[in-house]
């Protein structure tokens, strides 16, 4: 979360992919549903969904937004939280900021490049920023 980047690194330590992200609006480690924090730690990919038809209401008065998750939703196995994942967006201007309800958000084009590199049960590590550590 410090650099607002997602990186795919192979077992030799070679970086295969990097892209800018948006993460949880609030600093710190996810504690409960609705806290707007991105979980920190070591997780696994539990599923990869086609999310093109999914909708989400951001409670901003605009109602349900089709395509809010972009073309794919990479679901993470996060104990106590069933809706955390890595996904695309309908709002690429949010990237590089803390704007999500807890997920990791990418540009749809970057997500399309990431998908061939991801498989179940791949390991995902989410590291805190210095400010996240202060808030924990």
Give residue ranges: language-model regions.
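Exported/periplasmic cell-wall-interacting domains
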Residues: 32-35, 51-136
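Conserved hydrophobic positions within beta-strands
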Residues: 43-45
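Intrinsically disordered, low-complexity
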Residues: 1-33, 40, 125-136
């Amino acid at each position: 979360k410090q650099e607002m980047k997602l990186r795919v690194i192979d077992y030799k330590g070679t970086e295969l992919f990097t892209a800018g992200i948006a993460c949880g609006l609030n600093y710190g480690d996810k504690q409960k549903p609705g806290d707007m924090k991105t979980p920190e730690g070591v997780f696994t990919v539990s599923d990869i969904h086609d999310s093109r038809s999914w909708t989400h209401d951001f409670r901003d008065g605009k109602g349900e937004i089709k395509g809010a998750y972009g073309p794919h939703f990479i679901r993470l196995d996060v104990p106590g939280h069933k809706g955390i994942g890595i996904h695309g967006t309908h709002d690429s201007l949010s990237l590089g900021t803390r704007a999500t309800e807890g997920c990791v958000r990418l540009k749809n084009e970057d997500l399309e490049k990431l998908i061939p590199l991801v498989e179940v049960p791949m390991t995902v590590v989410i590291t805190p920023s210095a400010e996240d550590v202060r808030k924990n």
